[in-house]
């Protein structure tokens, strides 16, 4: 099973850095005042996906207006790690826990993760609208919006052990060469099932795969063997 611990390595074009203006945050309540009830069927799932996309676009709009897109995507990466914990998701999904208590936990998350004020406001909007349950979907949608706005290619690298920065830089350069993207973000995941080596998934919705793992090599060897012809020594 893959480890939930993730790290991020970015390769970006050499452009002048943006001047981040954190002080001016637009209230998300005015930006996206909507609440959608989620049905327990396919239609409900589609509504949930639509809501996640809309919330993500609203947050991206605030980040663009504040010139804090890079800081906001960093916030999103932190939230991805926080809400990857099932206990956290279960806490916010529990209808017996009051909104006030959930807001207190949001405040703790904001402080411990050093999130921006508009990200904090965003999370509280989700709690008030009873949409915190789709935060992981919103994270994914925001990354898609960010990647499109910044011409960024996301590559997920899975390996048995943590790869060093020079190795990740080489992978980023290779993905950049293959895709022609201006920027490349490499997200790493520890996956012991690979035995050794690594895999790289990139492209739209991770449609392309480079598999350099020992697991893949063993599977290829196994598929070529005719096990019926193998005789074990006695």
Swiss-Prot record:
GO molecular function, one term: mRNA binding
GO cellular component term of the entry, any: stromule
Topological type in the membrane: Peripheral membrane protein
Glycosylation sites per record: 66
Keyword Secreted part of the UniProt annotation: no
Record PTM Phosphothreonine, positions in chain: 234
GO-annotated biological processes: photosynthesis; photosynthetic electron transport in photosystem I; photosynthetic electron transport in photosystem II; response to cold
Subcellular localization: Plastid, Chloroplast thylakoid membrane
Keywords: Acetylation, ATP synthesis, CF(1), Chloroplast, Glycoprotein, Hydrogen ion transport, Ion transport, Membrane, Phosphoprotein, Photosynthesis, Plastid, Thylakoid, Transit peptide, Transport
Protein name: ATP synthase subunit delta, chloroplastic
